[in-house]
């Protein structure tokens, strides 16, 4: 099994190299992602692939201009979802998972799930693992 979660660092690169909201290069992201998947399949044609949606929450640095950065993250997520379909991979909707958790009235604050808006806490990782097992575990 090849399980891949990438995308947020692409946002971080754009965020760190600019003075304000900029666009992420989704064409390059897709080309690089395809290269990884194609080379993996070439090495092991039987590999089962799991592709995870990148995610952010409005915590830490993402709070400023969150709507813009979230739209950029969603663009990357759409690429991942498309590739999952093309490569017959399992798709893990992690942004959807964290959106649902963020809107749960029992959540004390968003940093309960992600301490900086990018990196999950232990509680966030637990929910990700549960989703992974639900979607992938039955196919093992």
Where is each model-derived feature located?
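Alpha-helical cap/lid subdomain in secreted, periplasmic
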Residues: 1-140
């Amino acid at each position: 099994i090849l399980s891949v979660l990438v995308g947020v660092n692409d946002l971080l690169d754009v965020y760190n190299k600019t003075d304000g909201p900029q666009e992420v290069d989704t064409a390059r992201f897709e080309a690089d992602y395809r290269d990884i998947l194609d080379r993996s399949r070439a090495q092991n044609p039987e590999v089962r692939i799991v592709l995870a949606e990148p995610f952010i929450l409005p915590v830490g640095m993402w709070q400023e201009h969150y709507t813009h950065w979230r739209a950029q993250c969603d663009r990357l997520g759409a690429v991942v979802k498309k590739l999952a379909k093309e490569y017959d991979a399992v798709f893990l909707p992690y942004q959807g998972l964290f959106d649902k958790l963020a809107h749960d009235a029992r959540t004390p604050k968003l940093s309960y799930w992600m301490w900086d808006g990018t990196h999950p806490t232990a509680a966030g990782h637990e929910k990700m693992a549960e989703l992974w097992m639900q979607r992938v575990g039955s196919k093992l």
